[in-house]
A protein has these predicted regions:
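Non-catalytic extracellular/periplasmic "stalk"
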Residues: 1-46
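Catalytic cores of peptidoglycan-degrading enzymes
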Residues: 42-166
Length: 166
């Protein structure tokens, strides 16, 4: 009888250890899902036609001077949907100089994303948006050479190459 009680106690301890392991795993999965939801990782439009990459480039307006391009330009049809690359809050929505119709989203982990040259905007400052939600439509507003989306990613206020997150 003592052997059975000892075995039962041992099995109970093993079950409690497995339960703790599963709870830790569940916590890790939830944290990873949260990180993925609020980190820019969704390509912001249906086209993958990058016409201007992040970094140094020849100025597309004069064809010879060099300039720094803080994002990627993605050619697409005028009016194609633009999606939030991660869940977050709309920090800015409206006209923003050379960016034309522009949206800036704030995300967790210090990330912000910016979307420029749109034809129309469908979200307002202060609004919460989910990853993949339509926030506007591709256009050619502002200082632009044709219909495309200008897309930027910043982390803690510093420009980063969007390609490393997509």
């Amino acid at each position: 009888m003592d052997i059975l009680i000892a075995q039962e106690k041992n099995i109970h301890q093993q079950l409690e250890a497995k339960k703790a392991d599963l709870e830790n795993l569940l916590t890790t999965i939830k944290e990873e899902n949260y990180r993925r939801e609020y980190t820019p990782s969704l390509w912001p439009t249906d086209s993958y036609d990058v016409t201007s990459s992040y970094g140094g480039r020849v100025n597309p307006f004069d064809g010879y001077s060099s300039d720094w391009h803080p994002g990627v330009d993605i050619a697409n049809n005028y009016g194609a949907p633009v999606y939030a690359s991660a869940s977050g809050v709309v920090l800015q929505s409206g006209w923003y100089g050379g960016y034309g119709r522009y949206i800036k989203l704030g995300h967790d982990f210090g990330f912000t994303t910016a979307y420029g040259h749109m034809s129309s905007l469908v979200v307002s400052a202060g609004q919460y948006v989910e990853k993949g939600e339509i926030i506007g439509y591709v256009g050619s507003s502002g200082y632009s050479t044709g219909p495309h989306l200008h897309f930027e990613v910043m982390q803690y206020g510093e420009q980063v190459n969007p390609s490393q997150y997509m």
